[in-house]
Regions:
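Structured soluble/peripheral alpha/beta segments that form catalytic or ligand/cofactor-binding pockets
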Residues: 1-293
Length: 293
């Protein structure tokens, strides 16, 4: 998966885009794997979540391999695609939202200050990796439907794995925020083998990384779906806005303090124990429909 996150300079808008090859959250892919190995290209989607001041829109339509094409610098799923020109990542979106069908169309452009080279292995078996491709980027959003234009601070990364996410991890907490000198990222996960992922790092605009000792862990108020949220901060953090509240997943903006500096974090919480519950699996098609082409 490739993930793009951004917040507008005025703090009123946000966007998340995730390009999936073999969607880790797909109920159709999970069903196909019950009978043996399944082709990940037959389960692709471009997930778009738009967080405007007074509204939200979500689209995540899965499509078969016949609707997918990719090259060394582009990835197309149905009517939407991502392309890289050597300087910027451009995402052209033409999707239908769910569960209420509305058109979501427009262009997003992410311009990184630098591309990093280091990926991180997240478990002992080595079948899950994370690469913070562009810790610092400027993002321009130009949506036609809904009509929305803004620019702001952003980021993109990549997760790669050859095993189901829920088989390797039970809980996942990730956050990233812009700092005066670049960006700070916190990545924590509880593995099924009892081990932990604990990453705390900063990046400057030239891509130079430094690790730091993460501050104390704070437990935040649970979401409406009772998803737990935890974040590290040098003083008491606060939830500014719950952007996404789903049965197994939450995305929030959080005010915190890292390295003696106040930061606004884009934060995600993922409960994989909750995700694999049968009742949750039965809900997924309502937000993640599958198209025939």
């Amino acid at each position: 998966t490739e993930n793009i996150d951004a917040l507008s300079d005025d703090g009123k808008n946000g966007i998340t885009i995730i390009a999936f090859i073999g969607s880790v959250f797909s109920p159709y892919y999970a069903l196909a794997r019950r009978n043996g190995p399944a082709d990940p290209l037959n389960h692709c989607a471009i997930n778009v979540a738009v967080y405007a001041k007074d509204s939200k829109r979500w689209a995540m339509t899965e499509r078969p391999s016949s609707a997918v094409s990719r090259t060394s610098n582009s990835f197309t799923v149905g009517p939407s695609n991502l392309s890289w020109d050597g300087k910027a990542l451009t995402i052209r979106i033409d999707e239908i939202t769910a569960p209420i069908p509305r058109r979501l169309r427009g262009t997003i452009r992410a311009v990184p200050t630098v591309i990093t080279q280091q990926a991180f292995t997240l478990n002992e078996s080595g079948n899950h990796q994370w690469w913070p491709i562009a810790p610092c980027a400027r993002v321009q959003v130009a949506l036609v439907l809904p009509h929305l234009r803004w620019q702001g601070d952003g980021y993109f990364d990549m997760n790669r794995g050859d095993a189901p996410l829920e088989s390797g991890f039970s809980d996942w907490q990730w956050s990233r925020g812009a700092t005066r000198d670049g960006a700070a990222i916190l990545y924590e996960a509880l593995r099924r083998d009892g081990g932990r992922v604990d990453l705390a790092m900063t990046f400057d605009p030239r891509g130079r990384m430094q690790t730091f000792e993460p501050p104390v862990l704070h437990t935040l108020k649970r979401t409406g779906w009772r998803i737990g949220r935890e974040v590290r901060s040098e003083d008491a953090p606060s939830v500014l806005r719950t952007l996404e509240d789903a049965p197994f997943y939450a995305r929030s903006t959080i005010s915190a303090k890292l390295l003696d500096e106040p930061v606004i974090l884009m934060h995600e919480s993922l409960s994989l124990d909750r995700f694999r519950m049968p009742i949750v699996q039965s809900m997924l098609p309502f937000r993640m429909p599958r198209a025939r082409r």
